[in-house]
Amino acid sequence: MGARVLISEMWYYLAICGMDPMLSAQTLGVIGGFNVLGSLFFGWAGQRWNKLALLGGIYVFRSLALAWYFMLPPTPGTTLLFGAIMGFLWLGVGPLVAGAVAELFGLQWQAMIQGLAFMSHQLGSFMGAYGGGLIYDALGSYNLAWRIGVSLGLAAGIIQVAFALIRPTRPPLAAPA
């Protein structure tokens, strides 16, 4: 719930905090720039370390960044720093998921399984954005949405790291020609 609520609701969150909603556009730009760096870094890191553990680490650090940002009163500086952190961690899942799918299931089914993995991410994004809006409409505050986002992210990260520790990785098997 956390990351998607951030994109769809940040402009409104900043406005109700008395900040210029244009800061939301600037933050989205920072997120986009750091997405590139994070994707490159995690692609590199996934070649060297356990991809599943790295994925779990991303989920945990996203949640910690979300908790940090919403525990503080927002300022332009903290908002842009938060955007940089989230951007670095956001799309870093792409190369890790692709590599993990290849290692876990082989290359023969990679396109289908990777498609299902990203479809589930998109369904989660929809539920997060829509759910965050519903929570705000019902309660007049995003606090519960942030707490749910942090809790789900921490749980996902811990489960992912635990799974990484019990499941050994293997090189992907070649698909038949």
Pin down the residues of each PLM region.
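Multi-pass alpha-helical transporter architecture, strongest
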Residues: V150-A177
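Helix-loop junctions at membrane interfaces in 12-TM secondary transporters
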Residues: M71-F82
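Helix-to-loop junctions at the C-terminal end of transmembrane segments
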Residues: S39-N50, Y136-D137
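Loop-to-transmembrane helix entry/capping segments in MFS-fold secondary transporters
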Residues: P21-M22, L107-A117
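Structural signature of the two symmetry-related core transmembrane helices
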Residues: A53-W68
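Extracytoplasmic gate region of multi-pass secondary transporters
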Residues: M1-F42, G128
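Intracellular juxtamembrane helix-capping segments at the cytosolic ends
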Residues: G92-F105
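A membrane-interface helix-boundary motif in multi-pass transporters
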Residues: L134-L152
